[in-house]
Regions:
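Short strand->helix junction
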Residues: 1, 152-154
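C-terminal catalytic histidine-bearing segment of alpha/beta-hydrolase fold enzymes
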Residues: 26, 176-189
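Alpha/beta-hydrolase-fold enzymes
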Residues: 2-110
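Secondary-structure transition/capping motifs at alpha-helix termini
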Residues: 4-10, 169-177
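Short, well-ordered amphipathic alpha-helices
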Residues: 160-171
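Mobile cap/lid helix-loop segments that gate and shape the active-site cleft of serine hydrolases
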Residues: 98-134
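Short beta-strand/loop motif that positions the catalytic acidic residue
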Residues: 140, 146-148, 152
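Conserved alpha/beta-hydrolase "acid-adjacent" motif
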Residues: 154-160
Length: 189
């Protein structure tokens, strides 16, 4: 909303959200590489076709789980049972959240994959609304607060923060837009 109507919202929080989809450290966090190896967005279209026009968000969870099979198959359960007296509530809460994925229709997921993951058009201000308004994150006039972590293999810091260097040439450019951006990078969480 802030990228289209600058005066409408207050501070904008971005908790580990990918905004610069092409960013990443070479050889780490292979989600983008995995998508490229599949040959683009045809897998998304096929999956939606097989789902009769629906895309089950469980496929996204499956992709994330495959990033670290050792955690999925061993560590997660080991941690639960090694701390069974204290870990059960946290484990159940996380699994409910993690398994509470969203279902999308074919058009929605195809747009997300083509425009964001492949096109990287949000970070480069190339997305327009149906009304023709350009979504430009530089238009946000509220402070932007970003949280990210080196331990996040789904949204590494480069994807959470890379939009800043995609949109602003340098600190002076950022100041010229009157923007305030505060971010923190945790080492492990």
């Amino acid at each position: 909303v802030g990228g289209v109507r600058p005066g409408v919202c207050g501070a904008v929080a971005s908790p580990g959200s990918p905004l610069s989809y092409w960013a990443g450290a070479e050889g780490e966090n292979p989600m983008g590489d995995a998508g490229g190896l599949a040959g683009g967005s045809w897998v998304t279209a096929l999956t939606s076709d097989l789902g009769n026009g629906k895309f089950d968000g469980g496929h996204l969870v499956e992709n994330f789980e495959s990033l670290n099979p050792a955690n999925t198959l061993w560590s997660k359960n080991y941690d639960l049972w090694s701390k069974v007296d204290t870990e059960a509530a946290r484990f159940i809460e996380f699994e409910k959240w993690w398994g509470g994925h969203v279902n999308l229709n074919a058009e929605e997921i195809q747009w997300i994959v083509d425009e964001l993951f492949i096109g990287n058009r949000l970070a480069t201000a190339e997305i327009t609304t149906r009304a023709g308004d350009r979504i430009d994150l530089r238009n946000i006039r509220s402070p932007i607060i970003c949280f990210c972590s080196e331990g996040d293999n789904i949204t590494p810091p480069q994807q959470a923060l890379g939009w800043i260097v995609d949109l602003y040439a340098n600190d002076d450019d950022l100041r010229a837009y009157g923007q305030t951006i505060v971010y923190t990078v945790h080492d492990t969480v």
